A protein has these predicted regions:
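Beta-stranded membrane pore/translocator domains
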Residues: 1-211
Length: 211
């Protein structure tokens, strides 16, 4: 099991690294399990030192975190983090929703402290090509993130709580002041480029595919 991903920059920018270090991880699978168990920290440090020399890591001032899980099915998880920013782009396709079921969002965030982010967002509803923009703030506390977003031009406020149950599972609760609506969702990450979210939006349940 091998995974290299980031929640700080779009994963598509790391494709070259992902394929390169897949080869490095294949070399580890050829080692005896007992050896990997004894030297796990040294092997993690070796991978970290190699990653720190990569242009993508240096140019974007990224911070890799590596976890090796010894065993017959050896696992290598590489998270590429940043202390400075969070940038992501997502597309949404909603199955079982009557309107606004195709959309996309861009998020550009700047970390102003280890636990605090200010950001701007741009969202487009593809059904009627309607643009929405917002500025906001997030406070990160443990596995949770508390966000406030002021959306324009509609002028309403969003309040959002997200909680990571595990690297793959996430809960979301969101309140939209404009129509006084609450939204509850459970999200599962299938792989780096695809997630699925089951959403209850106040009057309807629907499945959201996120790419």
């Amino acid at each position: 099991r091998y995974e290299l991903r980031s929640e700080a920059i779009p994963n598509v920018l790391l494709m070259k690294l992902k394929y390169k270090y897949a080869g490095e991880c294949d070399k580890l699978r050829g080692l005896p399990v007992a050896y990997v168990q004894r030297h796990r920290q040294e092997l993690e440090q070796q991978l970290l030192e190699k990653l720190m020399t990569e242009p993508e890591v240096k140019n974007y001032q990224l911070r890799p975190e590596i976890k090796i899980t010894p065993g017959a099915d050896l696992g290598v998880n590489i998270m590429i983090e940043s202390d400075d920013y969070k940038i992501w782009f997502e597309g949404y396709g909603d199955i079982g929703r009557d309107k606004e079921n195709l959309s996309g969002k861009a998020h550009l965030g700047k970390m102003i402290s280890p636990h605090d982010e200010i950001f701007g967002e741009a969202e487009v509803i593809l059904n009627n090509v309607q643009w929405r923009f917002g500025t906001g703030y997030t406070h990160y506390w443990g596995k949770s993130g508390w966000s406030y977003v002021r959306r324009i031009p509609i002028g309403d406020n969003n309040y959002r709580l997200e909680y990571s149950l595990s690297p793959k599972w996430r809960l979301r609760v969101e309140h939209f002041s404009g129509d006084n609506r609450n939204e509850f969702a459970v999200r599962y990450r299938i792989h780096e480029f695809l997630s699925a979210e089951y959403v209850y939006g106040g009057k309807e349940f629907y499945l959201r595919l996120i790419g």
